[in-house]
Amino acid sequence: MLKLLSLMVPLASAAVIHRRDANISAIASEWNSTSNSSSSLSLNRPAVHYSPEEGWMNDPNGLWYDAKEEDWHIYYQYYPDAPHWGLPLTWGHAVSKDLTVWDEQGVAFGPEFETAGAFSGSMVIDYNNTSGFFNSSTDPRQRVVAIWTLDYSGSETQQLSYSHDGGYTFTEYSDNPVLDIDSDAFRDPKVFWYQGEDSESEGNWVMTVAEADRFSVLIYSSPDLKNWTLESNFSREGYLGYNYECPGLVKVPYVKNTTYASAPGSNITSSGPLHPNSTVSFSNSSSIAWNASSVPLNITLSNSTLVDETSQLEEVGYAWVMIVSFNPGSILGGSGTEYFIGDFNGTHFEPLDKQTRFLDLGKDYYALQTFFNTPNEVDVLGIAWASNWQYANQVPTDPWRSSMSLVRNFTITEYNINSNTTALVLNSQPVLDFTSLRKNGTSYTLENLTLNSSSHEVLEFEDPTGVFEFSLEYSVNFTGIHNWVFTDLSLYFQGDKDSDEYLRLGYEANSKQFFLDRGHSNIPFVQENPFFTQRLSVSNPPSSNSSTFDVYGIVDRNIIELYFNNGTVTSTNTFFFSTGNNIGSIIVKSGVDDVYEIESLKVNQFYVD
Amino acid sequence: MLKLLSLMVPLASAAVIHRRDANISAIASEWNSTSNSSSSLSLNRPAVHYSPEEGWMNDPNGLWYDAKEEDWHIYYQYYPDAPHWGLPLTWGHAVSKDLTVWDEQGVAFGPEFETAGAFSGSMVIDYNNTSGFFNSSTDPRQRVVAIWTLDYSGSETQQLSYSHDGGYTFTEYSDNPVLDIDSDAFRDPKVFWYQGEDSESEGNWVMTVAEADRFSVLIYSSPDLKNWTLESNFSREGYLGYNYECPGLVKVPYVKNTTYASAPGSNITSSGPLHPNSTVSFSNSSSIAWNASSVPLNITLSNSTLVDETSQLEEVGYAWVMIVSFNPGSILGGSGTEYFIGDFNGTHFEPLDKQTRFLDLGKDYYALQTFFNTPNEVDVLGIAWASNWQYANQVPTDPWRSSMSLVRNFTITEYNINSNTTALVLNSQPVLDFTSLRKNGTSYTLENLTLNSSSHEVLEFEDPTGVFEFSLEYSVNFTGIHNWVFTDLSLYFQGDKDSDEYLRLGYEANSKQFFLDRGHSNIPFVQENPFFTQRLSVSNPPSSNSSTFDVYGIVDRNIIELYFNNGTVTSTNTFFFSTGNNIGSIIVKSGVDDVYEIESLKVNQFYVD
């Protein structure tokens, strides 16, 4: 279904906007605006981003795939009793068949003491029963062991718990802790199985864990998950912030010059593993692959010359990536995530270069963790917590607080960091059951439209659900633009019930940057909380030549994920509109004449229950 | 003079603030709000931050000190014909006796062609006439040579110009360029004299220059400024952004466990050089030193154990610092500055560690350059451009655009990056003639005041000049605070003529971070430009123990420079109020009871002509 309206809008001259709320008495009202009366809350709980029905959630934990039941399991830092962080902190649990719809399971396990926290950690499948926790009554594919941090009485230690019922209930190991270094900042173990390059290698478990306020990722090895040997540390690299948290080390396929025919929304259930050093091509045939026929995005990565460091990756077909979250201290404010591309020999991680790379340039992307045991062996799937510690406890939602990011599929690619240089980057592709989501939805398209300042275009959604994807490709005529004129292409994502509330998303041609303004809301939190950065931006390099740009986005009630340049740059940000005010239209506008051509703007509004 | 008012303010309950401007017709007005009608401009030109009277300014260039005349010279990227960047781009010039009051000199030199730019560069004093440009008629202390980039017709090359009249007029070298590598992105040479560690060394000139879009700082040497040899490159380190620009390499004194009796505002005219490997102690006796008796800030750096890497610095008493600006691509948006602490052997720079450090966490601090030939040899004095390329051409000022930062004096210190770890940092101290500025000003003080939510304090300025310094020390009682309550100490810097306009500055106890909100203004640019980040924040670690914090700030009409923890963390940001609306009062308030004690808030309003 195509709906295309063209309305004339009266163009008012530039006016000083008086904010009558900003005098002393209004300032006084700000001082008192921390209450959570329901009128000041946004109840627009996301549909395809996981959130618990009630209570507080932070970091994703223990992500694993059950190959027997074909279920995806996620756990998370969970305080079920109130929508704010509190003790005892437990592990919540949810299960999905398609990484899209999640079935909440409640508390999986918690700490023994009321004033303790079962802090973040990971899960592994102990197929070969190295731990001795299992016997033949547990299918090898379901021999789940959780490795987590007990925070109690000024001490942080690493603990084990195991499950005999496929991850629904857990027993705590009687000889816990398995790691205690007499520290109050030693947390977030992520464990994986390292088989070794040598075919005769027996393999062993490897743990990365943060000595948080020393900015150290400690790397341990173990034969049995119980006895751990410190092998090395990766310390004080990149941007430090105030603390390192939630480290992770993962082998990521290197993809060169690949046409992502199916991107974004890659196939994560193709049969059989892709060979790591082959060129990855995603199948379109899977039930949850991107449906290329509805929103085709045929974007080819550049053929530019590889920089020296990539020759190593070309040969082996993968790199190791060290993920580190830091909090607070981001120059964007609060918490952030960085990563390092390098090599791992079983005991030591060595970065390939000295570049500091941030993963996701938005404000709400923290504590990324990857799944253990993806069915397609080379797929690296991960979830981050879509919030920021600066304001996470105070975001205006009720009775839950915080959601996860979408699942993303990560690859290492090279991209044009500018017109003369390529750089390696961790590429992100969102993973959802797009076929099903689009099936009963509605679609809208704009094509081949040159924008001018005297008119605008409106895509108006039928029965707004607040959940949709969009794909924008545009070209820019840089000739004759003036640096003193704000030269924008703007998309206004406007509330259906209250048009005062909108997201403004756009590009400015002088600065060659993309912007997002999430400040246009009637919710007091948005108006007043000084940590809720309203205006965000990213540099958006062209995807293939110098004048064509693209952005893909998924909007889900109160969160927007943006994927620039086919996923080489991302920005994930929450936003808060009044209860029930779903985005109902997209207004496409430019303040200048004949600078922008919309090559295509395609929108699929998802049908959700 | 002490003024202390305590007013009761009616506390309204939290209310939804309706923004009536946000419907479609108001959106339309945004599209057209790029005009510069005088009613939408802020004419609040700063008083002690340099700006040209008319026209466009960007990077500081060619900073040097004339020891004969005892004058400080600055040059800058200057387009005098309009308040926006344009060609031909020239070098503007200004002179000061005290780094506080600047005497504008107009254009020093420009390119030969109308469509060319005399892009950024530096100046040196060629005491020994290595260049051959001088004879005995020019005092050795005034043998000024400018090294700059000619940008013309898709090429960037390094050029020389020299002055026989102490830096007022220049002659271009007839055999220009002196460096041409067939590049369109080869710019911003910064040259210094390297004497070498060996007493028999003859010394030579060293240039750092950016191969911008290769993320390379090229390091050249020369005996005569004309013939340059490529020695090494410093490439792809730290955060890349989109381009490297304005590199600089400078030897910075290492200061350990020093009480800055005179900080901030350090002495830059003490007689005789301080020995580089002695402990630096700043004199209080100088005419332009910080006057400790009026606003004493006796802050002692911690005695915590040095990390390993500092032992090298302890021994030699200094480190080399590589300054790199990058644009765009900062996660805060647009342009930013980073630096690397390391060693330089005359040909190669090697960082001491792999940490990425940003210099100034605000939005408006770019293209930092240091002075050649400071009278006190160990002083490292520098100036940055106080704007951001995202919006610099569109900020609402007229008929000038952009100002410089204050001069800062830099040292390497260690600081408590968190409660368990120290890190090396480039410490900043603002340099101004504080004695003179305070002399005819007015002073205001608050002391030993526990804040509660039912009242507030007001410091009201007599005859607001818009230019003042403030020093805040506060302690926080973390016991019993709630993570779901925004637990703030807020300072509202309110306009005298229009109280709708204010800066909100404060600290939040749950996140342990400091915030600045510059969004409360009636100026359309502030309301509408999506790149003008309104809300900024920094992590503010305690200065000495776990519950006492400090911030020092200088406000100058439309710019605020914040120095946290005695200068270890800074944030520089412009702001824009309506014409003539100077800050006239500071309202001190907390939304919670008995969490904050103001140990002291001291304010000196400066008298300016």
From Swiss-Prot, chains A, B:
GO cellular component: extracellular region; fungal-type vacuole
Binding residues annotated for substrate, in chain numbering: 56-59, 77, 119-120, 187-188, 245, 389
Catalytic reactions on record: Hydrolysis of terminal non-reducing beta-D-fructofuranoside residues in beta-D-fructofuranosides
Keywords recorded for this protein, A-Z: Glycoprotein, Glycosidase, Hydrolase, Signal
Intrachain S-S bonds: none
PROSITE patterns reported for this sequence: GLYCOSYL_HYDROL_F32 (PS00609)
Any Pfam family matching the protein: Glyco_hydro_32C
InterPro entries tied to this protein: ConA-like_dom_sf, Glyco_hydro_32, Glyco_hydro_32_AS, Glyco_hydro_32_C, Glyco_hydro_32_N, Glyco_hydro_beta-prop_sf
Glycosylation: residue positions: 23, 32, 36, 128-129, 135, 227, 233, 257, 267, 277, 284, 291, 298, 303, 345, 409, 420, 440, 448, 452, 477, 545, 566
Superkingdom of the source species: Eukaryota
GO function terms (MF aspect): sucrose alpha-glucosidase activity
Span of the signal peptide: 1-14
Keyword Glycoprotein among record annotations: yes
Active-site residues per Swiss-Prot or TrEMBL entry: 59
Enzyme nomenclature, EC number: 3.2.1.26
Protein name: Invertase
Organism ancestry: Eukaryota, Fungi, Dikarya, Ascomycota, Saccharomycotina
Gene: INV1
